[in-house]
Amino acid sequence: MLKQRTIKQIVKTVGIGLHSGRKVNLTLRPAAPDTGIVFCRVDLPTPVDIPASAMAIGDTRLASVLQKDGARVSTIEHLMSACAGLGIDNLYVDVTAEEIPIMDGSAASFVFLIQSAGIEEQNAAKKFIKVTKPVEIRDGDKFARLDPYFGFKLKFTIDFRHPAVDKTGQALEVDFANTSYVREIARARTFGFAHEVEMMRELGLARGGSMDNAIVLDEYRILNNDGLRYDDEFVKHKMLDAIGDLYVVGHPLLAAYDAYKSGHGLNNALLRELLAHEDSYEIVTFDDPLKAPRGFAYDTQTAFA
């Protein structure tokens, strides 16, 4: 049987919120089978648990934000991406503010945390959402689409008219049957434009943003002294985001995802469209792990190649 996974022990870290600029304590705790990924606002007078789900995503303008009973947890996508990449099904995420710390702007810190805690298989079958019919959402020239596929592959195209981005490749296709999430995707950082950062700060946002946790561009070039971690880091980060956004559905997808200029809002709309049509998916498990598709969340020995 292909089994569900959690972490072996509690791990903690401290970081800053990208938008608030304030210190945030983050604790990851093991969770029982069929718990899912649950975010806990432990700083509130009465702590609020918010299970990750497509229907709990509220605001998507700058990040994916979970909302429940007036409580929010923002910027969950990088941590969710790491959980997807390492095949973590069940986890409690305790946080002392309304946003997950930005760390270095990628998923690498969360991958390291989960690997440090250790990954434990549980005595329950891992559930997958198998897409059985195409589902698509469009918004002007932007689109996001899921097609049936026995595995998990993604194709993402960005369109940033900028000299530095133009040089790096605006499209990427990855099949996790033969690609390592940890090596090829996890280290891609978020990016932004210097003039936008100034505007956001005037609105009280991006107070924690810096070259320590983002690639910053002016009109012509990358301002970070250390340059890029991957030749195509921009589109890889958008793919990292999409993996995290899609994992909010509650289980790993067996599907092919294709997107053009998609973001958090379109990705969430795609999941809602999928869930609204019960004939477009089914929940499946694998009694024989050898019959499961090869892929980054399914390898029983390690979660990554």
Curated annotation (Swiss-Prot):
NCBIfam families: lpxC
EC id: 3.5.1.108
Regions that span the bilayer: none
Gene3D superfamilies per the UniProt record, alphabetical: lpxc deacetylase, domain 1, lpxc deacetylase, domain 2
Protein's UniProt keywords contain Lipid biosynthesis: yes
Natural source organism: Paraburkholderia phymatum (strain DSM 17167 / CIP 108236 / LMG 21445 / STM815)
Disulfide bridge partners, by residue number: none
A Gene Ontology cellular-component term: membrane
Named cofactor requirement(s): Zn(2+)
Pfam entry (one): LpxC
UniProt-recorded name of the protein: UDP-3-O-acyl-N-acetylglucosamine deacetylase
Gene Ontology biological process terms, A to Z: lipid A biosynthetic process
The family this protein is said to belong to: Belongs to the LpxC family.
MF term (GO), any: metal ion binding
UniProt entry tagged with the keyword Zinc: yes
